[in-house]
A protein has these predicted regions:
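Flavin (primarily FAD) cofactor-binding/catalytic cores of flavoenzymes
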Residues: 2-49, 82-429
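N-terminal glycine-rich dinucleotide-binding loop that anchors FAD/FMN and/or NAD(P) in oxidoreductases
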Residues: 53-78, 217-234
Length: 429
């Protein structure tokens, strides 16, 4: 059941869930199943970021059989298909309707503070106040676009974040520099190149797992090799960019292929001065790092197949890599943007957290990040959901957030049980 902001009035709920993306919908399902009164507050529409903060040609990064909640399949799509973004958003709407999730849209949460008179919280919204015993921050990992302070905002070149990009037609005529070569950057660069644009792609450190290998998708390999359930990231991998895509039916990202398509590859974007953008001499090293990751996955997969006596077709050609792109061997260290005809810089540089509305002592670190264990905050009664590595590698993904939501609902139920215990005491002589 979805209602709009004008229907809001002062109320009390046991739980307020902030955000109605995949995390908020999953949280609502488990709270509903536990019989816990709650409301989900969403500033826009259900799964809004899928609709308005992603480019038009975006598809899910995993196949339909995997990137979903357990009890509802994607209707009308092959299990191995990569579902378009609008259909993903529609999926969450349908899922919420399936169990009549108490979602209220068009409501902006302004602040959450501790009540002065009891152990609960006061939630200030754009339409009034709500008292809650527990608050779940389910605003996800994509909160505040992060643009490095490299190019001043007042230069003549047009600058935008990937969250504001929708299609090539919205950009000024001319070449485009895409900064960032993760899933978003490589897909947007390919989208622009397909439209006939001159495209430059600044490539930093990254992993690039195979899309498919020996008849199985990357998500399957991550599962059987135990990587989805890693509780902590490997050393140095906390913020590694992952270049994987469902674009064009799903192909392994290889920067050699992008170069062959006419995209000019560059190293890490480092500095800007007087119309000149400079790049680090690290492109060859960054591509080599990605290749090493790619080959390591193939090796682990081959070993798993042998150990488990699986009948999966050999794929020796997957181990053969082509020569380094010419820009890696003879790197371009600087570009005069005007002379190169570059009129747009598109920053595919990720997101920062934004919990400026959560004003509860102990809930956040000094850096403004969640202070928690498996989503249970250091501040009693506050919970976090949808963040990368919340409990495991899969925590920020559709299926992973569903399992984390179940855990948090269980924790809330446990706290309710303790707090409802009346108890008795008697003196023993």
């Amino acid at each position: 059941m979805v209602v709009t902001g004008e229907q809001m009035s002062a109320e009390e709920f046991e739980v307020v869930v902030v955000g109605a993306g995949q995390a908020g919908v999953a949280m609502s399902e488990h709270l509903t199943n536990a019989g816990i009164s709650h409301v989900v507050l969403e500033r826009a529409r259900i799964a809004e970021r899928w609709r308005s903060e992603r480019w038009d040609s975006l598809v899910a990064n995993g196949p339909a059989w995997h990137d979903r909640f357990p009890s509802l399949e994607f209707e009308g799509y092959d299990p191995d298909a990569f579902v378009p973004k609008e259909a993903v958003a529609d999926y969450f709407v349908a899922y919420a309707e399936k169990f009549k999730a108490p979602i209220r849209t068009g409501i902006d949460v302004k602040s959450v503070t501790k009540n002065s008179t009891d152990a609960g919280f006061k939630v200030i919204t754009s339409t009034g106040e709500i008292d809650a015993k527990y608050v779940v921050a389910a605003t996800g990992p994509f909160q505040k676009p992060a643009i490095p302070p490299v190019v001043p905002a007042d230069v003549s070149v047009h600058q935008l974040h990937s969250s504001d990009y929708h299609n090539p037609e919205q950009l000024p005529e001319g070449g485009v520099l895409v900064v960032g070569a993760g899933s978003s950057g490589v897909q947007i660069a390919a989208d622009l190149r397909k439209a006939g644009r001159d495209v430059y792609l600044s490539v930093g450190e990254h992993d690039r797992p195979p899309r498919r290998y020996r008849g199985r998708d990357n998500v399957w390999w991550l599962g059987v090799l135990g990587k989805w359930d890693l509780a902590t990231p490997p050393a140095g991998a906390e913020h590694v960019t992952i270049a994987v895509s469902g674009f064009a039916g799903g192909k392994t990202v290889d920067f050699r292929d992008l170069a062959d398509s006419g995209i000019t590859l560059l190293g890490l974007t480092s500095s800007y001065e007087n119309g000149i953008l400079k790049f680090a001499d690290d492109l060859e090293r960054n591509i080599a790092r990605g290749d090493k990751n790619y080959l390591s996955v193939l090796t682990e997969a081959d070993e798993f197949i042998a150990q488990n006596n699986l009948d999966l077709p050999p794929e020796p050609e997957a181990h053969v890599l082509g020569p380094m792109p010419k820009e890696a061997v003879n790197p371009i260290r600087e570009i005069d943007l005007a002379a190169a005809g570059i009129t747009t810089i598109l920053w595919a540089t990720g997101y920062a957290t934004d919990y400026s509305w959560l004003n509860v002592p102990g809930a956040l670190t000094d850096a403004g990040k969640p202070a928690h264990q498996r989503g249970v905050s250091n501040a009693n009664g506050i919970y976090f959901l949808g963040q990368a590595w919340l409990s495991r590698r899969g925590s920020a993904f559709i299926w992973g957030v569903w399992h984390d939501a179940k855990f948090l609902a269980d924790q809330i139920q446990i706290q309710r049980s303790y707090k409802s215990y009346a108890g008795s005491a008697r003196i023993i002589n």
